[in-house]
């Protein structure tokens, strides 16, 4: 019985490392100055009448949570793993809004999240969309 229990614990431990990727929230304290310094080389800051200072990436073809990155399942759930040097900030803090004039703009926020998106599915298809500023998440079950 002792061998079975030990084997079960060992197997569960190995399985947990195989299934999940370790992702940790940023241990550093973030503020607007940090975002401004880190993101300025890659885009521009503009004053939005609705949100204040927002950041716009230089590539007009950019789409958040779609361009240059991938989804990875972690111990926090699905997390966006960005290939951009600056991706640690806008994909895990703040929210994205699509502006008719500027295109995608990032609104700074100070709470870390694995990804600020809303998920949907139909049959074997899955989709996601960035959560806009001030939106809440609702969960529903059914067919």
What residue spans do the PLM features occupy?
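Classical secretory targeting signals
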Residues: 1-26
